[in-house]
UniProtKB/Swiss-Prot annotation:
The gene is rpsC. Residues 38-106 form the KH type-2 domain. It holds the Pfam family Ribosomal_S3_C. This is Small ribosomal subunit protein uS3. CDD domains: KH-II_30S_S3 (cd02412). Belongs to the universal ribosomal protein uS3 family. The keyword rRNA-binding applies. Binds the lower part of the 30S subunit head. Binds mRNA in the 70S ribosome, positioning it for translation. Part of the 30S ribosomal subunit. Forms a tight complex with proteins S10 and S14. SUPFAM superfamilies: Prokaryotic type KH domain (KH-domain type II), Ribosomal protein S3 C-terminal domain.
Amino acid sequence: MGQKVNPISNRLGIIRGWDSNWYGGNDYGDSLLEDSKIRKYLNARLAKASVSRIVIERTLKLVTITVCTARPGIIIGKGGQEVDKLKEELKKVTDKDIQINIFEVKRPELDAVIVANNIARQVEGKIAYRRAIKMAIANTMRMGAEGIKIQISGRLNGAEMARSEMYKEGRTPLHTFRADIDYCHAEALTKVGLLGIKVWICRGEVFGKRELAPNFTQSKESGRGNNGGNNGGGKNFKRKKNNR
């Protein structure tokens, strides 16, 4: 069933941590709905900032939001003006104090969310989907990934009948729980309808115990940080060389 299930949810509690870190009581449903609203708002508001992951932590009176992005300067703005503005906007959504941390993804080519969204934007910009996919595969493998698999589905090239095409290079062992597999599904809106884009990236294998809680080690409301566990840079991370 490793081929069917979402690779991220399949590894929760093993080598992958949760994106919402808090304990809920009777208000669990309200907090969950609030998290959904925050993520939906941020993904729409920061569509051009190459956002990879949004981690939400809660205390009684404070909501801490960590945004992982490949373009932190867009979110921070000049002198932090954009962050302050974003904080005020989110206060209206949650009615609680907001703290925003910015974490820079230093190798966006190894992040499935960023890769999938980049392909989708290129396809919407009328770039040939095969060219966009092959460029993404080449860039990802050049950055040291063990393997990548990309599937695109829909009315490709305006065909009357929808079909799926898959492109892959290297290895993506979905049944191996210690394999660090990143996954994302994105959509591209074209004149002939929606195209679905799925991306799997194997960043190596994790040996030994891995800290499941997000390890964002940069200062608050800054755009600099270590590579962390989000894009394959944890201290227990090892790579195997592929002879291609």
